[in-house]
Design a protein with these regions (language model features):
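Active-site diphosphate/adenylate-binding microenvironment
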Residues: 308-391
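Glycine-rich, acidic loop regions that bind phosphate or pyrophosphate groups
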Residues: 1-18, 54, 63, 77-79, ...
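Glycine-rich, anion-gripping cofactor-binding loops and their flanking helix/strand elements
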Residues: 140-227, 357, 363, 367-391
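Glycine-rich phosphate/diphosphate-binding loops that line cofactor/substrate pockets in enzymes
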Residues: 27-32, 120-136, 154, 195-197, ...
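Glycine-rich beta-alpha junction loops
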Residues: 40-46, 140-142, 233, 353-356
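Conformationally flexible catalytic loops at phosphate/diphosphate-handling active centers
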Residues: 27-127, 271, 286
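General beta-strand structural signal in soluble alpha/beta enzymes
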Residues: 10-12, 38-40, 137-138, 163-165, ...
């Protein structure tokens, strides 16, 4: 467990439970977010305790106790690079320090610093401008990095189709004009068509697991030049993904660098909110609103039109799913679609495993600011109830 967690502990003293729980919550959310593990034996779970006797966790004391490990770190310089947010505060400094300490403890290399003048930013822009069928491949790492808002700005300025990973379907609204589907084994046909026909892929926030690239991974993105950004350097070296330009960096930093560079180039984006028909109008191509000018599709369509065509023609939801009598069971795809359409913007939906997770990820109509939270790693039964409590 130690090698895959930020902190792990078996609780043997019932009176330490408050301290350990508070420590885990603080550590998992501070610095680079990551898992913490508490092993609580059943006899400890059944012990009676007095709340007044429990000692809490003090983050400042924890930092003081770890000063020996941090005494060689140039705190201001390193932490600013690791916590690239709009405003830099003391809490951000602590986050950056903990990132460094954790990586040194586990022998992990530091992600590189990226800004608008970095060569990789120019390379990405050059390849998108030259591409005929580019795709922006996104994952939940964008949200973990706190970059979901800047991602939408960058996507609008780039103007290329966006596909979403299994655990990131809520990173972009369903009706967003650039959304092109969900690739992977549990994704949909439009998303897989887009990836397999792409000639350039920019992947940010996704580790491109087997669930995303498939077991026949040698044919994944068969014609695409790929730029892959990951905060874990080892993810960029695995044999199941071909990476032409690996970017070992924080997702926020790369997106911020792209945003700044596109601003410098005078590219402001279309500003067309969730209107696919309006975006596809020919007068928008080449007007400087976005970096990409439409590209090449099939049968007289450009690339944006081609992806929009696939989204409509090969949607996992079909109209006949609604064709049933009142005394017949509802189709699960129809149920999920209607449920999602009845929800308001910025509402949170948490699902368990099985059809709720798989069908939900395929047909859920994500609205502006809404969340769709599912358990995507180890398929634990019963995840939905505690997750829903946490989401509230």
């Amino acid at each position: 467990i130690d090698c895959m967690t930020k902190y792990s502990k078996m609780v043997l003293d019932p009176k330490s439970i408050r301290y350990e729980v508070e420590k885990c919550i603080w550590l998992c959310q501070t610095g680079r977010p990551g898992p913490c593990w508490l092993d609580i034996p059943v006899d400890i779970q059944g012990t009676y305790i007095e709340d007044s006797e429990l000692v809490g966790f003090d983050p400042e004391e924890y930092l003081r106790e770890n000063e020996i490990e941090l005494d060689k770190i140039d705190e201001e310089e390193e932490a600013e690079h690791l916590v690239p947010r709009d405003e830099f505060s003391n809490s951000d400094l602590n986050d950056g320090i903990l990132n460094i300490a954790f990586r040194k403890q586990h022998h992990q290399s530091q992600p590189g610093h990226v800004d608008k003048d970095s060569p990789v930013v120019s390379e990405i822009i050059k390849h998108i401008k030259a591409a005929k069928r580019p795709v922006f491949y996104t994952g939940n790492g964008i949200r973990i990095a706190g970059a979901e808002n800047i991602f939408l700005r960058v996507a609008d300025k780039l103007g290329i189709p966006v596909v979403v990973g299994w655990n990131a379907i809520d990173i972009i609204p369903h009706e967003h004009p650039l959304k092109a589907g969900q690739p992977g084994g549990r994704g949909d046909r439009p998303g897989n068509f887009a990836v397999q026909n792409a000639d350039f892929i920019l992947s940010i926030g996704s580790r491109l697991s087997i669930r995303q690239v498939g077991y026949n991974f040698k044919t994944w993105a068969r014609e695409a030049f790929t730029v892959v950004c990951d905060i874990d350097e080892e993810e960029l070296k695995k044999p199941s993904v071909h990476v032409d330009i690996p970017v070992h960096a924080d997702a926020y930093e790369l997106l911020k660098a792209l945003d700044d560079k596109l601003d410098e180039m005078g590219i402001k984006g279309h500003g067309i909110k969730y209107d696919r028909t309006e975006l596809l109008k020919q007068e928008h191509y080449g007007d400087g609103s976005s970096l990409f000018d439409g590209g090449e599709g099939k049968n007289g369509r450009n690339w944006l039109e081609q992806c929009a065509y696939w989204m409509e023609k090969y949607s996992p939801y079909r109209a006949e799913y609604a064709d049933h009598g009142d005394d017949e069971p509802a189709n699960v795809y129809e149920f999920m679609k209607v449920l999602s359409e009845s929800l308001n913007e910025e509402q949170i939906t948490v699902v368990g495993n099985g059809s709720a997770c798989v069908v939900g990820a395929q047909v859920f109509r994500v609205k502006d600011g809404s969340r769709f939270v599912s358990q995507d790693a180890i398929a634990a039964m019963g995840y939905d109830l505690p997750a829903a409590i946490g989401a509230c």
